């Protein structure tokens, strides 16, 4: 294995301030090189962080797009320019190349500490399996959603999001900060153990696979006309079956789940997703058998 540099990104969203505090604290107290692996730290969206807002022109974590109809160089949005800078600096062909990107986020939803993956790259599965085995973290595998693309970690050969909540935007929570510190502190140790064949991946990886999202109930003007049902609040990762309540509108009407399949909701009531018309996303649970190819590809980084 030749993994040498890991990019740790905090503040991809400027009002998610706990990861920034955690990274600054870790950088003061820890050596930059351990097990032959060096961390590179960066605030993803420094201007938004200074202003205390999620972004300036566009969501930075949707700005790493590659398509024939999307020209990164001609877009005037600040976040597009920032995405180009991050890739030029820290991308695999950048001036300070990193093989792995870890993007640290907080959420107002009651997600606990979780891992977010985008797609089914073997290297990502390997890294996610290491962390799930160490900490027992749930994994949200985000795929099949063409309206949500351009995620930061997809611009690197390997990458994951660490998502922790619930915590309000622009509010420091020492418990949240400590969780980030534990994961950052342990990441290189787990990679080193794998490199030295001191640990193996678990036989199975449990993931919650994205199936879609649902908006709040709305009136004829398009305004929100319903709230998350009291029985659904703070129930991320908890199974929903047919007939379970989802929303309660202003007339007292209960909106129930009418699907035949069990689903597991995530990001329930996430404040930042209102603009995306998402009240919650829903997933199916999938058990994936670990593969030797995961480790083999990770070794090639």
Curated annotation (Swiss-Prot):
Substrate binds at residues 54, 61-62, 163, 273. It catalyses: an N-acyl-L-aspartate + H2O = a carboxylate + L-aspartate. Pfam families: AstE_AspA_cat, AstE_AspA_hybrid. GO terms for molecular function: aspartoacylase activity; hydrolase activity, acting on ester bonds; zinc ion binding. Gene3D superfamilies: 2.20.25.160, Zn peptidases. It is an enzyme of class 3 (hydrolase). This is Probable aspartoacylase. Keywords: Hydrolase, Metal-binding, Zinc. InterPro entries: AspA/AstE_fam, Aspartoacylase, AstE_AspA_cat, Aste_AspA_hybrid_dom. Binds 1 zinc ion per subunit. GO terms for cellular component: cytosol. Its cofactor is Zn(2+). The keyword Metal-binding applies. Zn(2+) binds at residues 13, 16, 105. Belongs to the AspA/AstE family. Aspartoacylase subfamily. SUPFAM superfamilies: Zn-dependent exopeptidases. Its EC number is 3.5.1.15.
